[in-house]
Amino acid sequence: MSQSKYRQLDVRAPRGTTLTAKSWLTEAPLRMLMNNLDPDVAENPHELVVYGGIGRAARNWECYDAIVKALKNLESDETLLVQSGKPVGVFKTHENSPRVLIANSNLVPHWATWEHFNELDAKGLAMYGQMTAGSWIYIGSQGIVQGTYETFVEAGRQHYQGSLKGRWVLTAGLGGMGGAQPLAATLAGACSLNIECQQSRIDFRLRTRYVDEQATSLDDALARIKKYTAEGRAISIALCGNAAEIVPELVKRGVRPDMVTDQTSAHDPLHGYLPKGWSWEEYQQKAESDPQGTILAAKRSMADHVQAMLAFHEMGVPTFDYGNNIRQMAQEVGVSNAFDFPGFVPAYIRPLFCRGIGPFRWVALSGDPQDIYKTDAKVKEIIKDDQHLHHWLDMARERISFQGLPARICWVGLEWRQKLGLAFNEMVRSGEVSAPIVIGRDHLDSGSVASPNRETEAMRDGSDAVSDWPLLNALLNTASGATWVSLHHGGGVGMGFSQHSGMVIVCDGTDEAAARIARVLRNDPATGVMRHADAGYEIAIECAAEQGLNLPMVAATQGNAK
């Protein structure tokens, strides 16, 4: 069998209510797989790359075709198994089991290196699934906008008395994840300077309204920042260039941003971070001809970038890693104090995780934006008193352009996910929305990831690297009846540095779906509360007790035991 990773084909998910598979439970993963490769969604769809360096939706185009065929023929009591983007088996299960089970990029720990993975990838034996690329629930840059927004808002609360008006953020990377940063900063009230080395990515963000304008030079960018901050306007500015050159230059000039982070694809030095002085074309060529030399050159450039971030940190500028493992890469080439500035999770997000709050998302399979607007209204109706959340939904409707099938991201926790899912299912049943809705989340969630340099950095009990938790999350979601469940390795921070799981559940308006939703959308966020309660976080222990969790080794929950 040939193993083509390139095909000149534009893929788009079907819209409307006509099925191309045998039920909505198999139509949903089919549409979401296709949606991941929509040219308006994916970063490089003709090569099956969705986002995050080489995060793919299928191993090769032959595997993609086979997955599509399998999903179209899948019966309501069968389960498709996908191994690193390749469909490997269809098995008889039962109607409440997942229709698809996915395992991507998983390697035995001793061999879990980029070097070994790249050898397997070259042989057609593996696929890097990132987080939502290989699990078919990527929704474009919107998927991380609210998390980035919440991070910036919390940083403003901690460092600037709750307001980012007249402030500016320095960052880099405008890919599928990093592309959320300029809009998130704007929504949080700040200006931003966003460095990106590929003009095509800047064009994509300008077209989708994630970035407001592009500067012609560093001097031009700084002049715009000075003007807009003085006026109290929140405008995002893109600058085409290499962060490893521009960020140190800003330090040299004595420029002082109000916040510094980075979201380049530093997790993958072979494909995701342009070495200083190289063109993108040269980078791609050398990645093939001299991979080890290319990796070293990329890491040395990251070291310069991180040293500049450390300089800002030492000036007292709030500086944080936004989860791309750039500190680790710099440390590996001699920046011994790379971890002096924190990651964003321990600095700003962990209290949310303790309550099971994370990136809940849903997609209208109809393709009709009105279905999303109706669900927005339903969220406001159910969560009546959360004005911060209402403000987010209003801003999202006004500012966020849908990419592919209409979708919404909304950070909610254990208290609300089940209620929202059941309400959405009822909207499908009653015809209030025109077709079923799928509910999923990022793997970046409170109970679904072990990543010592990101989500589980600096855990109170030192359990940063314990990866039993995402495995238990995947097993529980499978037992609870999620429509598809995924278990990945290496997302966000690269091979050897993370394990994580995902789930998606379909709201098709049936009683059977309601029962599955009730189980999945309680149990999934509950694993996050459990994980943090087990680590000794008081917020999580209180949440577990309040929400009726039965955690045998957490005394505060024993009143919930039957």
Swiss-Prot record:
<dbReference type="InterPro" id="IPR035401">
    <property type="entry name" value="Urocanase_C"/>
</dbReference>
<feature type="binding site">
    <location>
        <begin position="242"/>
        <end position="243"/>
    </location>
    <ligand>
        <name>NAD(+)</name>
    </ligand>
</feature>
<dbReference type="Pfam" id="PF17391">
    <property type="entry name" value="Urocanase_N"/>
</dbReference>
<keyword id="KW-0456">Lyase</keyword>
<dbReference type="InterPro" id="IPR023636">
    <property type="entry name" value="Urocanase_CS"/>
</dbReference>
<feature type="active site">
    <location>
        <position position="410"/>
    </location>
</feature>
<dbReference type="InterPro" id="IPR023637">
    <property type="entry name" value="Urocanase-like"/>
</dbReference>
<keyword id="KW-0369">Histidine metabolism</keyword>
<feature type="binding site">
    <location>
        <position position="130"/>
    </location>
    <ligand>
        <name>NAD(+)</name>
    </ligand>
</feature>
<protein>
    <recommendedName>
        <fullName>Urocanate hydratase</fullName>
        <ecNumber>4.2.1.49</ecNumber>
    </recommendedName>
</protein>
<feature type="binding site">
    <location>
        <begin position="263"/>
        <end position="267"/>
    </location>
    <ligand>
        <name>NAD(+)</name>
    </ligand>
</feature>
<dbReference type="InterPro" id="IPR035400">
    <property type="entry name" value="Urocanase_N"/>
</dbReference>
<dbReference type="InterPro" id="IPR055351">
    <property type="entry name" value="Urocanase"/>
</dbReference>
<feature type="binding site">
    <location>
        <position position="201"/>
    </location>
    <ligand>
        <name>NAD(+)</name>
    </ligand>
</feature>
<feature type="binding site">
    <location>
        <position position="492"/>
    </location>
    <ligand>
        <name>NAD(+)</name>
    </ligand>
</feature>
<dbReference type="InterPro" id="IPR038364">
    <property type="entry name" value="Urocanase_central_sf"/>
</dbReference>
<keyword id="KW-0520">NAD</keyword>
<dbReference type="InterPro" id="IPR036190">
    <property type="entry name" value="Urocanase_sf"/>
</dbReference>
<dbReference type="GO" id="GO:0016153">
    <property type="term" value="F:urocanate hydratase activity"/>
</dbReference>
<comment type="function">
    <text>Catalyzes the conversion of urocanate to 4-imidazolone-5-propionate.</text>
</comment>
<dbReference type="GO" id="GO:0019556">
    <property type="term" value="P:L-histidine catabolic process to glutamate and formamide"/>
</dbReference>
<feature type="binding site">
    <location>
        <position position="322"/>
    </location>
    <ligand>
        <name>NAD(+)</name>
    </ligand>
</feature>
<feature type="binding site">
    <location>
        <begin position="52"/>
        <end position="53"/>
    </location>
    <ligand>
        <name>NAD(+)</name>
    </ligand>
</feature>
<keyword id="KW-0963">Cytoplasm</keyword>
<feature type="binding site">
    <location>
        <begin position="273"/>
        <end position="274"/>
    </location>
    <ligand>
        <name>NAD(+)</name>
    </ligand>
</feature>
<comment type="pathway">
    <text>Amino-acid degradation; L-histidine degradation into L-glutamate; N-formimidoyl-L-glutamate from L-histidine: step 2/3.</text>
</comment>
<dbReference type="GO" id="GO:0019557">
    <property type="term" value="P:L-histidine catabolic process to glutamate and formate"/>
</dbReference>
<dbReference type="GO" id="GO:0005737">
    <property type="term" value="C:cytoplasm"/>
</dbReference>
<dbReference type="InterPro" id="IPR035085">
    <property type="entry name" value="Urocanase_Rossmann-like"/>
</dbReference>
<comment type="similarity">
    <text>Belongs to the urocanase family.</text>
</comment>
<dbReference type="Pfam" id="PF17392">
    <property type="entry name" value="Urocanase_C"/>
</dbReference>
<feature type="binding site">
    <location>
        <position position="196"/>
    </location>
    <ligand>
        <name>NAD(+)</name>
    </ligand>
</feature>
<feature type="binding site">
    <location>
        <begin position="176"/>
        <end position="178"/>
    </location>
    <ligand>
        <name>NAD(+)</name>
    </ligand>
</feature>
<dbReference type="Pfam" id="PF01175">
    <property type="entry name" value="Urocanase"/>
</dbReference>
